[in-house]
Amino acid sequence: MHAELVLDARNGTGESPVWSVAEQALYWVDIPARRLHRWRPADNAAQSWEAHEMLACIARHPAGGWLAGMESGLFHLRPGDDGRLAATHLADIRHALPEMRCNDGRCDRQGRFWVGSMHQEMAAGHRAGMLYRFVGEAGGAPLLPWLDDLVVPNGLGFSPDGRTMYLSDSHPSVQAIWAFDYDPDDGVPHNRRLFVDMRRHPGRPDGAAVDEDGGYWICANDAGLVHRFSPDGRLDRSLAVPVKKPAMCAFGGPGLDTLFVTSIRPQGVDLSDQPLAGGVFALRPGVRGLEETVFRG
């Protein structure tokens, strides 16, 4: 299957793609550039806005704009005509170490926002990462962690019925994807178990998406692949993209049947074998995805 380049974005770390059904547009972030991007297929128009600090993940906000996991916590971001993102502080995250930030995040099927944190020096392997839940607590109170002892939490996803939560850790020392039983009523994950040992497959587990049949799609960082695992953890197929570091994927397009893939453009390395690194790509895998849930807060 051919991966189509939709935008030669040259993102340092392109992450958190979210399809806006209302706008028929793809949004995503470039973490180190502190930018939110938008691309509309209808007219091939691209636009971006600058944030006040690194932003790592986004979910649609009910008041318009975006709920974003950033360096210091969670913010409500609203794109402005001046090319900047107006930010309203929602919640602090008291990181375990300096130089940490949010990483992967998304809403469950009921609109609760889950987000992980990591140390910015990934190579150090600090097990200081945590997983947090935000349901709109008032007053900007610091979030309390639900899970700790993580290095690079990633791969958050929820089954179509909302009763299974997925989480991965991308660090080379871990490379695991876990599944949890998840109660849609109270939003509490339990019964953590190994879903996929990614050391048995090419690439490290990065960002993910779930299709309407329950297939779990995850970007295989360093391998230039996007894997689909069936709900029982079996590898169903692997699709190639023309870059080594696909970062996250999301279903979009008019029928939610296009799998968009963001990627990473490494610094200080020869990119002659992957000149499109940091681009956004489209795959048509023959399955449909699910619309991302709006934050309920």
PLM region descriptions:
Residues 2-8, 44-50, 88-95, 141-148, ...:
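A short beta-strand motif characteristic of beta-propeller blades
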Residues 9-23, 52-69, 96-112, 147-164, ...:
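Beta-rich, blade/repeat-based domains predominating
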Residues 35-37, 73, 129-132, 176-178, ...:
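A short loop-to-beta-strand structural motif that recurs across blades of beta-propeller domains
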Residues 78-83, 137-138, 179-188, 285-290:
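Short loop/turn segments immediately following beta-strands, especially the blade-tip
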Residues 79-81, 132-140, 227-237, 253, ...:
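Flexible "stalk/tail and boundary" regions
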Residues 84-146:
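Hydrophobic alpha-helical segments and helix pairs
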Residues 252-297:
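Blade-level signature of beta-propeller repeat domains, shared across WD40, Kelch, NHL, RCC1
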